[in-house]
Amino acid sequence: IFVYSSIMDNNAIDNKFFFAIFHSISAFCNAGFSILSAGLYDEAIRFDYFLQWIIMTLIVLGGLGHNIVFNFYQKIKTHVVELFDKTIIHKKVRIITLNTQIVIYTTLVLLIGGFIFLFISEYNNTLLEHNSIFGKITAASFNSVTPRTAGFNAVDFTKMNVPSLLFIIFLMWIGGSPASTAGGIKTSTFALATLNIFAVASGKSRIQLFGRRISSESTSRAFAILCISLITIGISIVAMLIFEPKGTPLLTVAFECFSAYSTVGLSLNYTPTVTEPSKYVLIACMFIGRIGMLNLMVGLLRRLNHQFYEYPKENILIN
């Protein structure tokens, strides 16, 4: 309804009802598909800032995950019941889970940090076509949201500065949240890896956050996912550089591989020109990124028998 109302007076769009349904589903599912040839950068809707904020909201909600949204629903429902039914005595229950808190805080940091960085980096570049300050804020915000991992383009990414492209690669790599429609290594994985670094630097043997202790199994899994993703993407980049003509920019190839692994769909307009072997590399990268290399390895290598013994423990020198 909101998407339809934003384009109701736009004569350049023919089937407005279908446009609204298609883009709403595409945004919430983090698909990034558009029926317009230039996507949301099309001249017909390039400066429709109301539409862009609606699309951003749908992308974020889809990228948070159904369990996070349901957790907030439980919280709101409890507050409403307590507000209108004073006769019921409720015990203080921890409704918002630790997973929800980690996902929300990490998402906010990435969104706000991404907006500030891209607003400063692109202010005198791709944001110049937006005359108003509100337009520049909207464009910078959209560029911070869409790499994780919707894939809509509201600017020409080929004209972006190198620092901006590197930061977008970073956002694409992280992606959305667990049990969501987004790809990437996930916000909780990045958060746990970051928290573990600070815990090790502080001399702590465990991660404690918001009055809860995070299991070592979760931390190990997070680092495994992080390392496997970088190895997979690195192999994909090397493979593409072998198959592509000499002189192909490394940044362009890296951008395509990170986008493929996280199933983002953003491109520097290079994908249509890649060689046949490189297309298979990108296909494999997308498949592994969507399924998860760790999940594939667990499915192939995990044994059914359980070990009921332990070997002696010994420390290894690191750094």
Regions found by a protein language model. Give the residues of each.
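Membrane-proximal intracellular helices of multi-pass ion channels
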Residues: 1-319
